[in-house]
Amino acid sequence: MGQHARLQGPRLRSLPELRIPRYAWLLGMTTLCALCLITAAAAQDIASFEKRITLKKLNNGLTVLICERPEAPVFSFYTHVDAGSVQDPLDKTGLAHMFEHMAFKGTDTIGSKDYPAEKASLEKVEQAYAAYLRERDKPIDRDENKIKQLETAWQDAVKQANQYVIPNQFTEIIERNGGEDLNASTNYDETNYFYSLPANRFELWAYLESSRFMHPVMREFYKERNVVIEERRMRTDSNPIGRLLEQFTTAAFQASEYHRPTIGWMSDLNSFSATDAENFFNEYYIPSNMVLTVVGDVKAGEAMPIIEKYFGRIPSHEKPDERITNEPPQNSERRVVLQEMAQPLYLEGYHRPDYLSPDDAVYDGIADLMSEGRTSRLYRALVRDKKIASDAAGFTGLPGNKYAHLFAFYAFCMPGHKPDEMATAIHEEIDKLKTQDISNDELKMIKTRAKANLIRSLGSNSGLAFELGINQARYDDWRELFRQVDRIDKISKADIRRVANKTFTASNRTVGIIETAAPPSAQPSKGGE
């Protein structure tokens, strides 16, 4: 899920109704107990929390973190793969997201009626597609008749391979065994896989989860690629906000890999192959590039040997190179303006350092001050008092936060008001940050909400698994989850003013605007005036 979810809405995957009773009341009990646990941990120290956590790096390089939480007989997991759209090859954008889809298609033992025959058929599919692509993409001397013949041969090969497929077998096994919240997400920085199961299905989970990252099969690849193409059409090409965000991001990042859309460019979606996806998997889905977190009714002494038995089978490889292109300093404002039949919108973003910056907590504090709830500065000024916007906020982490990224502000215009008014009002609030100290009450509220948000985020097994996993992956230490609250607690009024003056400058700003287009003029009817 992208960090600009407030603009786009969450990415959801529809799932069939489960076939066994859900564990809603147990999960509720888990949440209640978790609040007590985390509150106590925050009030005391990390040591009390450490008693429940076991951390181990397997011989193949996989980092495993287990948190014992026995309040309900369920567990959740979070598999973090340190590869997102930033790692997409230049001419194959969208490949990280595409493989996420393929990870649900099964393995060499799940999802096939006859895998040896299917494997041979899939090889023929790739051969036919490569021949079709070579002719289709010739810069000169293309033979249109030959292209049609090769396309037909490729599609016939796909049909032949599809006869061996058992659709959705991987997900149905999980659901039949009580799986909940089965999903995955790809963003610019990483790819995540997660769901929950009853505790007595732990070994089944270990087999399933390790198998899909050991023996994935690129079955139904081109069918699923069409699903992704349609997803792009719906979320970007046919969506004014999606179009703005894509063009805004490419304007703000001209060198950094953040200028590539996670969904991928349409020409790349229409070109990359199952072989490309398999190559991406082989390079990035390796134990040293992954963190596995399990939280729930499991005992580390029993669970870790099971994890080693199954996940330890995955071959070890050297961690891939993480170097990316650094965005050079911006020296003048950039603007993107779209004319759309849509509600007018004003968006602006300012370059800021990555999440390892000493000022990361200060940026979080500014985001809280400007945007958290109906008492936030932007909501009060633009929505409540001036009544010029239907919504207004600021947030950090656009489009990701692992590398240098943007701190953004936005406002949706009320009828009769224009984006320029939003810009003026937002800049007035930014200028206050630069020239005036925030109040004692505001500073206290920033720090109080940071602690409350931590407690809230860890209330469920899945939430805790995510937070522990992402911090272990990013900092090589899950304890950073709690240290971030300590860093926010040390923010001063002077820090807010200093960072605001350093970051929120006109030359460092990229602006994105949606202006409401005039409706098409009525065409006079024949014979009329």
Predicted region positions:
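A cross-taxon signal for low-complexity, glycine/charged-rich
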Residues: 1-20, 25-29, 33
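C-terminal segment of classical bacterial N-terminal signal peptides
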Residues: 32-42
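Proteolytic maturation boundary segments
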Residues: 40-65, 291, 299-338, 351, ...
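M16 family metallopeptidases and their MPP-like homologs
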Residues: 67, 72-85, 94-96, 111-211, ...
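Active-site recognition of the HExxH zinc-binding catalytic motif
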Residues: 93-105
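A generic secondary-structure signal for well-formed alpha-helical elements
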Residues: 102-107, 201, 212-220, 232, ...
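Non-catalytic, conformational "gating/processing" segments within enzyme and secreted inhibitor domains
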Residues: 218, 225-226, 233, 241, ...
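His/Glu-based metal-binding/catalytic segments typifying zinc-dependent metallopeptidases
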Residues: 233-235, 249-250, 319-377
